[in-house]
Swiss-Prot record:
Induction: By 8-methoxypsoralen and UVA. The lineage of its organism: Eukaryota, Fungi, Dikarya, Ascomycota, Saccharomycotina. Involved in vacuolar protein sorting. Disruption phenotype: Leads to cell death when overexpressing the camptothecin mimetic TOP1-T(722)A mutant. This is Putative vacuolar protein sorting-associated protein TDA6. Belongs to the VPS62 family. It comes from the Eukaryota. InterPro entries: VPS_Associated.
């Protein structure tokens, strides 16, 4: 009885102190580190989501860019500023499935259609075996059947449920972030009028899905493509977008945390000067799912309110530098051009492969398969880089269904703060309430509303609509 009374008194004390803090502290100290930037944007009446400000030209679809509008004039040539601003990736400290090389990965598969018929004619696949379409004699009657690659899957030769060695990937080198066995994929797209999009793709052999209230994992799949987009205007980075599951988050480039890293000058570089220290953007890769976030901590997957049963977790684990090992290409909306002989040796057909980069979803009768209300344990593998909407004008790969405001993808001006023990607070982080709060005056009223909306539904709705 005494314990119950003590808990009740403690609860009232906490509530009283919280109310006093909400009523007294906000008028004395306003927690809006980038309020001048907000005021500037509001004064400009900025509504065009394809412009940084009223002085910059529009972004064009890559297929509509004329010769006079081109930002890149030599197919296959990768600008140095793209490499210099490549994101660094903090992998999770307890990660089990690390990055891998797609050329090594495909050797462990055969190609099958959705009915289980074998499409590949030999073992030890290479990237040259991945094509846009196939013509196969399925029934042994010397009649070829046309099968589009969208109807096939890479099917494991081993039981992936037992974690064969090739499924685990490779850990980057400590200190440098170099990963000799896991090249990233870089695709640079000319968006005209000085705009250039640099897509960095990160490949992991396996996606280990999240747990729901301690049960799972759910949504596992063999093969996992994640990516980030750095959008440049005349060589200056303006935006950064990072994928997370079927969507992602876009940021103004200045809003994202940076990491100083040394870039050694190569002997063949003709310009003067020695080694250079560059400020590179940081991305945090979530445990198992490899979803990308801009901060460390717990990130709500679908339900971002008081109750977060489905979450991703990030921390400052091993640092991976994709710019030290990558395959690179340029893409004009129609033609892919390799940047060197290394990429030419891999061929280009694999980029046009529309099939799943992992096994088809296991049937319910398979003993490895399990089901929960919203998800299966094992789902089908993802599609490859060329089918991630590289021709997008919007910063995001797609518009969030619930967010029609500002095109569904406004670029955030503050990092969305995570929850949990690994979460951090910096001057770049917002309080997870939308910029609608910045319009409220007087400040003491804003402070009260900020307190009342802390991790509340209304606050999260504003975050969705205003960033």
């Amino acid at each position: 009885m005494h314990c119950v009374l003590a808990r009740i008194l403690l609860w009232f004390l906490i509530v009283d102190l919280s109310v006093i803090r909400a009523l007294v502290l906000p008028p004395l100290k306003d927690y809006d580190p980038l309020e001048p930037l907000m005021k500037r944007d509001m004064a400009m009446g900025q509504r065009n989501r394809f412009k940084v400000d009223g002085q910059l030209p529009p972004i064009l679809n890559s297929t509509d860019v004329t010769d006079d509008q081109r930002s890149l004039h030599t197919p296959g040539e990768i600008p140095s500023y793209v490499i210099n601003h490549c994101p660094l990736v903090h992998l999770y400290s307890e990660e089990k499935y690390w990055p891998s090389d797609i050329a090594e990965y495909v050797q462990n598969f055969q190609i099958k259609d959705k009915n289980g018929n074998s499409i590949s004619t030999h073992e030890n696949l290479t990237l040259h075996d991945l094509k846009a379409e196939y013509h196969v004699d399925l029934f042994g009657n010397k009649t070829e059947t046309h099968i589009p690659s969208s109807e096939v899957f890479l099917t494991s030769l081993d039981d992936f449920d037992k974690d064969p060695k090739w499924l685990l990937g490779h850990l980057p080198e400590y200190g440098t972030g170099y990963n000799s066995k896991a090249p990233a994929i870089l695709i640079v797209v000319d968006k005209g009028n000085g705009w250039v999009d640099a897509f960095w793709f990160f490949f992991y052999p396996f996606n280990h899905g999240p747990f729901i209230m301690g049960h799972g994992p759910w949504g596992n799949h063999v093969g996992d493509w994640e990516h980030s987009l750095v959008r440049f205007y005349k060589g200056i980075p303006k935006y950064l977008w990072m994928s997370a599951h079927s969507s992602g988050t876009g940021y103004r480039y200045e809003a994202v945390e940076k990491f100083k890293k040394l870039r050694k000058r190569k002997q063949q570089d003709s310009d003067d000067g020695g080694d250079t220290i560059l400020e590179r953007p940081l991305i945090f890769s979530a445990r198992g799912t490899h979803a990308n976030y801009a901060s460390a901590g717990q990130h709500a997957h679908d339900i971002p309110f008081f109750f977060m049963p489905l979450s991703d977790f990030t921390d400052r684990g091993p640092l991976w530098d994709p710019s030290l090992n990558f395959y690179s290409y340029t893409f004009d909306g129609k033609t892919v051009t390799p940047s060197s002989e290394r990429e030419e040796s891999l061929g280009l057909d694999w980029l046009h492969f529309q099939g799943g980069w992992g096994d088809q979803q296991l049937p319910a009768r398979d003993p490895r398969q399990k089901w929960c209300v919203a998800q299966w344990k094992y789902i089908g593998g993802p599609r490859g880089p060329l089918f991630k909407k590289l021709d997008r004008l919007n910063l995001c790969g797609g518009v969030k269904k619930w967010n029609f405001w500002n095109g569904g993808c406004p670029a955030r001006r503050l990092i969305k703060k995570a929850e949990g023990l690994d979460s951090e607070s910096t001057d770049l982080m917002g309080d997870n309430c939308g910029v609608l709060l910045y319009r409220i005056r007087p400040k003491w009223l804003r402070g009260i509303l900020r307190f009342l909306m802390w991790r509340g539904i209304l606050c999260s709705l504003m975050e969705f609509f205003t960033n």
